[in-house]
Amino acid sequence: MNIILLDKIANLGGLGDQVTVKSGYARNFLFPQGKAVPATKDNVEKFEARRAELEAKIAEQLAAANARAEKVAELAEVTIAAPAGDEGKLFGSVGTRDIADAITAAGVEVQKAEVKLPTGTLRETGEYDIDLQLHSDVITSIKVIIIAEA
């Protein structure tokens, strides 16, 4: 199925690219999320008329993500208190939601989907460097310190 991308999609293309994808991927993911439209003659003309508006919107989103990344860099670290045993092993774990809530409480709005934990949840006290993917082009890092609750 031929489609026109309305946003940058990893491993597929950028704004305005006409690409061929499987019809299920287009119908079930790209179309419902507003990331693409079918590449009909009518849609191509409509897209070309709106291209400047869409490019401005994407540039605005990138600028907002860069501003948030600077705020995260100023924050540098965030501390989370969690119940733990004598040897530093947590009762439970610290996941993406806990980290996102702690960063948001510190003053920078972060969604849990933007927190990347490639090794899974954190289960011990200590310091961890966590990546935040604020935009497809903007990835920043923050130090998360997990301490035992008193």
From Swiss-Prot:
InterPro entries in the cross-refs: Ribosomal_bL9, Ribosomal_bL9/RNase_H1_N, Ribosomal_bL9_bac/chp, Ribosomal_bL9_C, Ribosomal_bL9_C_sf, Ribosomal_bL9_N, Ribosomal_bL9_N_sf
GO biological process: translation
Family statement drawn from the similarity comment of this UniProt entry: Belongs to the bacterial ribosomal protein bL9 family.
Main function: Binds to the 23S rRNA.
GO terms for MF: rRNA binding; structural constituent of ribosome
Gene3D superfamilies, alphabetized: Ribosomal protein L9, C-terminal domain, Ribosomal protein L9, N-terminal domain
Keywords: Ribonucleoprotein, Ribosomal protein, RNA-binding, rRNA-binding
Record's GO cellular component terms: ribonucleoprotein complex; ribosome
Species, as recorded: Alteromonas mediterranea (strain DSM 17117 / CIP 110805 / LMG 28347 / Deep ecotype)
Protein name: Large ribosomal subunit protein bL9
NCBIfam families for the chain: L9 (TIGR00158)
Keyword presence, RNA-binding: yes
Domain of life: Bacteria
PANTHER family named among the record's database cross-references: 50S RIBOSOMAL PROTEIN L9
